[in-house]
């Protein structure tokens, strides 16, 4: 991801989180988002990351982090331990997205999820014209090397939340930088105006 898109991405997430919130970033990578949220919102943050080298990088920055797997290790946390849980660009790489979502809204009051929207018009056009899986800045792996297991569209994600009994509160996207109250499925949002990543806030049941 480019630095410009990363800044826009972080800003959208920061706008969803009140100051001084307790936050867990699941799949926190090198801890850059937690650093940004600490600076902008003075959060009490901690991370979970499956890659040991990235865990060490977080620790070298003074970030509280544990080595863990979203599919296996969220069960260890008690209910409502955090104000917010964050899962950015990781949902599609989990083995059981439904279980992970359910755990995120169990351990926190609200969750913020971002994922590549496989229904975006550029992806659909690439599949239609080239008849090949798309490769881009946001989807940079060849199909046989990708860590991604479960691609989905925005509408697929909405259906999953309904099935899991999770309420979507707001949506945002990188193209407009706007936060919108969620009113249900929208063709423009899911195909024409949505970029490849969409952010959703899910309150607990």
Q: Where do the model's predicted regions map?
A:
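Conserved alpha-helix/loop element of class I SAM-dependent methyltransferases that forms part
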Residues: 4-20
């Amino acid at each position: 991801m480019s630095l410009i898109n990363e800044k826009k991405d972080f800003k959208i997430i920061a706008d969803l989180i009140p100051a001084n919130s307790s936050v867990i970033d699941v799949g926190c990578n090198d801890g850059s988002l937690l650093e940004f949220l600490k600076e902008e919102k003075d959060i009490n943050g901690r991370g979970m990351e499956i890659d040991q080298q990235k865990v060490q990088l977080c620790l070298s920055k003074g970030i509280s982090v544990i080595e863990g797997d979203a599919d296996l290790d969220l069960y260890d946390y008690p209910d409502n331990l955090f104000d917010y849980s964050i899962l950015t660009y990781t949902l599609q790489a989990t083995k059981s997205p439904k279980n992970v979502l359910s755990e995120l809204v169990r351990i926190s009051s609200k969750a913020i999820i971002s994922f590549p929207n496989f229904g975006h018009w550029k992806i659909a056009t690439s599949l239609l014209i080239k008849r090949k899986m798309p490769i881009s800045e946001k989807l940079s792996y060849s199909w046989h090397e990708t860590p991604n297991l479960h691609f989905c569209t925005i509408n697929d994600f909405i259906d999953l939340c309904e099935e899991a009994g999770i309420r979507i509160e707001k949506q945002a996207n990188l193209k407009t930088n706007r936060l919108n109250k969620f009113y249900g499925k929208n063709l423009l949002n899911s195909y024409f105006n949505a970029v490849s990543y969409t952010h959703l806030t899910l309150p607990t049941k």
